[in-house]
């Protein structure tokens, strides 16, 4: 988006510059049009224009002048019939009868227009514009040839060359000799010859009528101040007319071919028209020289009145035309100013959009930074929770291991007791077996003892043996009971041992839950770490984009500051603002700021990681404090020792130098 806005700003600036250049060029052209060289350069261009406003106004003056003298009007309308056939030239009466009707139609069409009707003059039909356009090529070429001959040969004056130069301006000298008859007859012939090219160039040469009118005015002033010469000079001027128009056309072609190829095409068309018109003027001059001598004496009385009327009309026309040109120029200038103001408004709106986008990007960057901080804090909290749960699990595992060790110890002690009791039972069984063997021996002895005298004794002994036997049986029963109880205890201990083994081999529900919780926390931690990495990458990309956008904005500001210029539309002056070295200096400052900011960011990251590490490890805090204290003490020691050594060295060197100087002076 920033690139699009910058491209739009550049396009608007280029359009403004083009408009300013066009306005300055138009003003320069208006200033240069007052000189004679620009007049003669632009007059041939307007010669081939199909619709000339000045020619239309002149056509109206012809009709006004012809209304005063009907014979001259009829004679001016003879030329189209003359060009249609060479036989009708010798019979002016017949041509007059045939051409009276078209002359009346032309006068009726022209009388409908007024001097102040600008739109009707532009919307006139092609038949009238072609006749008016045929006057301008010959008129402009004749004016150029007239000025050159006026400088070289001062004796030519107002010959037929002057009459040819006044086809579009209707001068008084030509009318006094009756030349308007031949000139007006020449205009339809030029129309018949040059109408295809004039119709093609109708739209291309309309803007150049302003300069053509100025050239016609100057030509009328130059020609009206001279006196008519003899017929011989007129004929010589008619003969020299094509010779003088051709180099003028060559000059014009040479000048305009250097400007553009379009002007070259127009010049070639004008040359073709001028060649045709030159051929016609030669024929007309040879035929009209005889008739002009007869008409000159009859029209000499009305010359002064016609001159005054035509001068008044010409002045009035010039005044109206100048006012129209001025209003048109003011309208063009206003349009250009409005366009410039509109483009400036668009430029300001685009700048506002750029500023708003920059603000939005800054806000987004701030929001992203806050989100990053929040996510980092959440990740730290999750890490702390994970560490806490891990410590709890470790403590529980340590307790379970201690309980397991105690149980194994108690199992080993019970097994030892069981073994000792089993040994005791075995010993008691052996004793019981010995007693039983002794009892059987005693029984056999009692059966073997004979005699009744001894029976009592035997009975007493048997009774004692029985009593002992009972005692032994009681002891045996007690021992068997103890053995049963011990066996029960052994079975219970074995069952407990098996349960403990099962518990050790198979984890309990609590341990399973703890392991599941631990796995969930590790997965959550991995996800958080991936999110943190993604956010860090997004942050890096956003920072890169922010730097790029800021760089573009600064470059656009620098370009606008360096390329900002103010142009005076009336004078065409440019005033450039800014300096050439300012952007380079700003670029250096910007690069230095970027490097410094990068270093500060790196140091900040290092310090943040160090603070996090020290916050989690209290022993590291103590060692860091001790290291900093030792480092400061070492730096102070180095500084103090270096200052003492440098001061003592300076004193020693000064003392040695003074002793050497003293010894040298004493030796001398």
Curated annotation (Swiss-Prot):
Question: Which cysteines form disulfides?
Answer: none
What cellular component terms from Gene Ontology apply here?
Golgi apparatus; Golgi membrane
Against InterPro entries, the record matches this protein to: Golgin_subfamily_A_member_5 (IPR019177)
The domain comment in this protein's record states: The C-terminal domain (508-668) is necessary and sufficient for Golgi targeting.
Q: Where is composition skewed (Basic and acidic residues) in this entry?
A: 26-39, 184-207, 215-237, 250-259, 303-312
Q: Which residues form a coiled coil?
A: 331-539
Keywords of the record: Coiled coil, Golgi apparatus, Membrane, Transmembrane, Transmembrane helix
- State which residue ranges cross the membrane: 594-614, 622-642
Mainly localized where? Golgi
**Record function comment:** Golgi matrix protein playing a role in tethering of vesicles to Golgi membranes and in maintaining the overall structure of the Golgi apparatus.
Instruction: Give the gene that encodes this protein.
Output: GC2
Q: Which stretches does UniProt call biased (Low complexity)?
A: 123-141, 168-178
What membrane topology does the UniProt entry give?
A: Multi-pass membrane protein
- Disordered as annotated region, ranges: 22-317
Q: What is this protein called?
A: Golgin candidate 2
Q: Where does this protein reside within or beyond the cell? A: Golgi apparatus membrane
Q: Name one GO biological process term.
A: Golgi organization
Give the Polar residues compositional bias ranges. Answer: 64-86, 100-113
Compositionally biased residues, Acidic residues: 290-302
